């Protein structure tokens, strides 16, 4: 215990602490951990769903930072026109191709026809089967079609020469195994 002088009186503090010094660092660590965790979740939300992130944080400075990062990401990483470059008055569809292929290949979009075709096929699938409700009749037809596809057909019989070649290969493998094993009598008995 260390005595400390305060206005002519002596106060004794356990553990030798001075007047005015903080107690434990635990509350500071808890607050710091909470802030870091919150920032981490906001960072993950930004990459998971950019629009929700923008709606949650309506700060103009954060919006400008997001716009700059999105423009950089579109130009440098994805090599496509910026998704925020279109005016907000234009109607945007929820299709993949309208989001990814904003312009033809000559304007900086995808110049790979296979990639363009793949995106178009995903877009067709998404607009026809996932995002739109189907009628009961269409659902029944699709269910019947999928059940017909799941019927297993028996395999076609193999030609006799293939069967004979397979039997000969198995017999040769067994003979080689018997020849190279130390315990060939026991292996022969089990076969």
Curated annotation (Swiss-Prot):
It is found in: Host membrane. It comes from the Viruses. The keyword Transmembrane applies. The chain crosses the membrane at residues 28-48. One of its GO terms (cellular component) is membrane. It is a single-pass membrane protein. Keywords: Host membrane, Membrane, Transmembrane, Transmembrane helix. The keyword GTP-binding does not apply. This is Protein UL140. It comes from Human cytomegalovirus (strain Merlin) (HHV-5).
